[in-house]
Amino acid sequence: MKELDLHGISHYDVKDVVENFILMNDTPFRIITGYSERMRNLTKNILDKHKFKHHTSAHNAGEIIITN
Protein backbone atom coordinates (compact mmCIF):
# COMPACT_ATOMS: atom_id res chain seq x y z
CA MET A 1 0.00 0.00 0.00
CA LYS A 2 1.40 3.41 -0.97
CA GLU A 3 2.06 5.81 1.88
CA LEU A 4 2.53 9.54 2.37
CA ASP A 5 4.30 10.57 5.58
CA LEU A 6 3.55 14.17 6.55
CA HIS A 7 6.18 14.34 9.30
CA GLY A 8 8.31 17.39 8.52
CA ILE A 9 5.68 18.99 6.25
CA SER A 10 4.40 22.36 7.45
CA HIS A 11 0.69 23.00 7.93
CA TYR A 12 1.05 25.68 5.25
CA ASP A 13 2.29 23.15 2.66
CA VAL A 14 0.05 20.20 3.54
CA LYS A 15 -2.75 21.09 1.09
CA ASP A 16 -0.47 20.96 -1.97
CA VAL A 17 1.42 17.87 -0.81
CA VAL A 18 -1.72 15.87 0.01
CA GLU A 19 -3.60 16.91 -3.13
CA ASN A 20 -0.65 15.95 -5.35
CA PHE A 21 -0.38 12.57 -3.65
CA ILE A 22 -4.07 11.65 -3.69
CA LEU A 23 -4.57 12.72 -7.30
CA MET A 24 -1.45 10.94 -8.58
CA ASN A 25 -1.94 7.58 -6.83
CA ASP A 26 -4.51 4.82 -6.95
CA THR A 27 -6.29 3.75 -3.80
CA PRO A 28 -5.89 2.18 -1.36
CA PHE A 29 -3.17 4.20 0.32
CA ARG A 30 -2.39 5.67 3.71
CA ILE A 31 -1.40 9.08 4.96
CA ILE A 32 0.66 9.38 8.13
CA THR A 33 -0.38 12.60 9.85
CA GLY A 34 1.11 11.98 13.26
CA TYR A 35 -0.89 12.95 16.31
CA SER A 36 -1.33 16.63 15.45
CA GLU A 37 -5.07 17.25 15.47
CA ARG A 38 -4.62 20.19 13.12
CA MET A 39 -2.70 18.06 10.60
CA ARG A 40 -5.34 15.31 10.78
CA ASN A 41 -8.14 17.85 10.26
CA LEU A 42 -6.38 19.56 7.34
CA THR A 43 -5.82 16.19 5.69
CA LYS A 44 -9.39 14.98 6.25
CA ASN A 45 -10.77 18.24 4.82
CA ILE A 46 -8.75 17.73 1.64
CA LEU A 47 -9.91 14.11 1.35
CA ASP A 48 -13.53 15.17 1.87
CA LYS A 49 -13.19 17.93 -0.73
CA HIS A 50 -12.12 15.33 -3.29
CA LYS A 51 -14.74 12.82 -2.07
CA PHE A 52 -12.26 10.15 -0.96
CA LYS A 53 -13.54 7.57 1.52
CA HIS A 54 -11.27 7.38 4.54
CA HIS A 55 -11.02 6.24 8.13
CA THR A 56 -8.55 6.46 10.97
CA SER A 57 -6.48 3.33 11.39
CA ALA A 58 -7.67 1.11 14.23
CA HIS A 59 -4.03 0.50 15.18
CA ASN A 60 -2.64 4.03 14.86
CA ALA A 61 -4.60 7.25 15.42
CA GLY A 62 -1.92 9.13 13.48
CA GLU A 63 -2.69 7.27 10.26
CA ILE A 64 -5.57 7.76 7.82
CA ILE A 65 -6.48 4.91 5.47
CA ILE A 66 -8.00 5.92 2.12
CA THR A 67 -10.11 3.24 0.43
CA ASN A 68 -12.00 5.07 -2.32
Set out the residue ranges of the language-model regions.
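Long, charged, low-complexity intrinsically disordered regions
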Residues: 1-68
